[in-house]
Amino acid sequence: IWAERVNDVPDPRDSEHLRVVAQQYAWNIHYPGADGKFGDVRVDLVDEQDNPIGLDRSSEFGADDFYTINQLHIPVNKKIRVDLSSKDVIHNFKLPELRVSQDAIPGMNIPVHFTATSTSEEFLETAVGTKREGKSLEIACAQLCGLGHYRIKGYLTIHEEEDYTAWLA
């Protein structure tokens, strides 16, 4: 049963499709832009300050792509497909509140999929009066990935569809 669930990866056309590239010590989130198609990425274009994913903006679909560092934004109640990879060592992409956890392995592209059923705001309202009160939703690394492991922390924001569309614009 579990294998059927995990291996039932949604088609990119039927989901919000993102790429997450892990590295010591950051989560690089690649969004395809308004055309919904990813531009090419090339290792020779990687620049840790200006282009950590090596996005080729001159490629056919690359001009409107963008990326964030440690900031994952997704819509609520929509299938999310993340193509997960790593630039350096094994990391573990973990969204604790969504019960998502998957190793990111150098040289591999691993699809992960999930659907968030409440917005960040709705989820955090349920945390009032608990240890989670006043916190945010996080992206964690659940694999000891080096001396700076404590620094690989990101944030997850789950939006209503119209707010997500506005954020993308």
Feature annotation, model-predicted:
Residues 1-169:
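Non-transmembrane, membrane-proximal soluble domains of secreted or membrane proteins
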